[in-house]
């Protein structure tokens, strides 16, 4: 984890935040751009560090020239989207996709033995796609090359989000707060909160919840399997929200506020509310760029359900290259479809909130469903299936 290294704070965060505060408005984007480039190169494979920076710049310059000198056309938008997706597929999904055809890696002519993931590729790919689509739809201004590269290479959010929007980031970049004391106090507090979650909760539970295999499942007392699953749910929430806390706090040191990502999702009483409060920047991105373009809730019932399933198929694939992540995403899609069907049959009472016992039952069902689905997030499909057979059958 980059966020728990002294190098992150002493070599990058503190010096860059101070320089950004002292820089003129014209030079701030360059400070963020250059510090982000150095950060990326330092914490990734240095022989590939320049490749991604060049790709970022190339994609932006292409879209910039088109939007400046030519009337935007749909093929330009699709070209930008396609090249960005291919870039992600090449690095993240190549071995997984070719492995579906050639199960034996030794016989796979397309297998990339030394495959690696460029730092933050899943996050900055979604930011690329957002920019390409929103520029085409004129939902955001173009900005300068330095401002765009500062947006992409803003290193506090590069590793683990939150996923930013250009039109939200740009005004904050141009009008950085001069309230040093308040920003640094709140930023440092948020960073410390994240570190406590990471070391005091997530890492403690990691020793217990990680590396569960079929032999462990076979030996375990069945009720302990359920305890293990709920412990993993707490661990992954503490882990993910810790990254977000540190990223949000780090951005605050620059005087820039980025989107919140987690808002007590496990306290929500239905799966819809859970996703409105879990990884919120990702959920909003999926709604705006997958669900709504597919037709959203404007279509007939069956089409709406299909839109939900496709959206969460994308969510699963985004989280990881494996069939288990697809299953995990589809399980959440199915839960959302069932919730929507149920509300068509049993609408919420018009006279006020549901009774307490109903809310409690709904919360328990949601909490159980979310945690049971985690099995496919942390295990391959075969091991997760055996886990459930052992848990429910014996």
Protein language model features and the residues they cover:
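Membrane-embedded transmembrane alpha-helical bundles that form the catalytic cores
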Residues: 1-394
């Amino acid at each position: 984890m980059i966020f728990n290294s002294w190098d992150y704070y002493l070599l990058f965060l503190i010096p860059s935040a101070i320089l950004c505060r002292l820089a003129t408005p014209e030079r701030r984007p360059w400070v963020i751009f250059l510090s982000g480039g150095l950060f990326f190169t330092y914490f990734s494979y240095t022989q590939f560090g320049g490749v991604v920076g060049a790709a970022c710049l190339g994609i932006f310059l292409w879209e910039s020239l088109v939007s400046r000198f030519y009337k935007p056309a749909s093929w330009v938008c699709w070209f930008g989207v396609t090249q960005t997706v291919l870039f992600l597929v090449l690095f993240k999904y190549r071995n997984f996709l070719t492995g579906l055809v050639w199960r034996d890696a030794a016989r796979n002519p397309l297998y990339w033995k030394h495959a690696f993931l460029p730092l933050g590729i899943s996050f900055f790919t979604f930011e690329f796609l957002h920019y390409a689509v929103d520029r085409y739809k004129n939902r955001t201004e173009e900005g300068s090359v330095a401002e765009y590269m500062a947006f992409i290479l803003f290193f506090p959010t590069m590793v683990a989000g939150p996923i930013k929007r250009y039109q939200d980031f740009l005004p904050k970049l141009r009008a950085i707060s001069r309230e040093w004391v308040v920003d640094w106090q709140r930023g440092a507090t948020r960073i410390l909160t994240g570190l406590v979650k990471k070391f005091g909760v997530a890492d403690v539970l990691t020793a217990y919840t990680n590396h569960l295999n079929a032999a462990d499942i076979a030996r375990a007392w069945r009720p302990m399997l359920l305890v293990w699953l709920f412990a993993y749910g707490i661990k992954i929430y503490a882990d993910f929200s810790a990254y977000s806390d540190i990223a949000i706090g780090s951005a605050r040191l620059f005087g820039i506020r980025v989107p919140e990502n987690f808002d007590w999702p496990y306290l929500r009483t239905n799966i819809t509310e859970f996703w409105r409060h879990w990884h919120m920047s990702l959920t909003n991105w999926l709604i705006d760029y997958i669900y709504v373009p597919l037709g959203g809730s404007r279509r007939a019932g069956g089409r709406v359900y299909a839109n939900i399933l496709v959206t969460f198929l994308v969510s699963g694939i985004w989280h990881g290259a494996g069939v288990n992540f697809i299953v995990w995403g589809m399980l959440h899609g199915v839960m959302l479809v069932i919730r929507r069907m149920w509300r068509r049959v049993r609408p919420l009472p018009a006279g006020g909130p549901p009774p307490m016992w109903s809310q409690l039952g709904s919360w328990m069902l949601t909490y159980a469903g979310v945690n049971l689905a985690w099995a496919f997030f942390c295990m391959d499909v075969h091991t997760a299936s055996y886990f459930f057979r052992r848990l429910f059958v014996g």
